[in-house]
Amino acid sequence: MKRAICWVLTALAVAGLASCAERQRQPDADALFGTVCSADDGLAMAKGADAVVIEGMCLTAGGEVWDAFYEKVSRGSPASVLCARYYTLDRERVSEELYEQEKNDYPKLFFYRLDYDGTAYTVKIRQSTEREPETEDAYRCLLHFTGSTPPTALWRKYDYYVLTDDPDVTWEDIEAGMFSSQLGAWIRHCAVYQNQYD
């Protein structure tokens, strides 16, 4: 009986050590933002870290991480979150010419490091294969937009969190500015979280 208990305890200890070793290999969200890696490696690490993962336009991991972040900032408490946005090039959705030009540049992964200090938001965006952030911008507001898409869209519903400086702007205003040919119609914003679903 003692021998059986020893074997069971040994097996549990080995399993526990293996689990700890795996956790130590996965960087936390802060370390992950600074990690230079391929898009596929970054995607795998983001799924193992406390990060929000968006593939294409669909949330695939970290929904609870985002919810906890949004709850804190909604109360005015400082908080940070890392979003990993992964993109592939779909041959069926682009012209053959564009596909041939761009195919070697995909997949791509962008890290969005979002910090809230209690009064303003700062977002740093870095492609996983680059050392330095491509952009760093500050915004006053984080707005939440939900709704239904037109019948011709690929998804039925959307859920977006967008940084902007205008607390009264709507998603329709932002979209109109993006597609307008009018000088000055663009509304400064950064979509940090986008989830489209049926």
Question: Which role fits each region the language model picked out?
Answer:
Residues 16-19:
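C-terminal motif of bacterial Sec signal peptides marking the signal peptidase cleavage site
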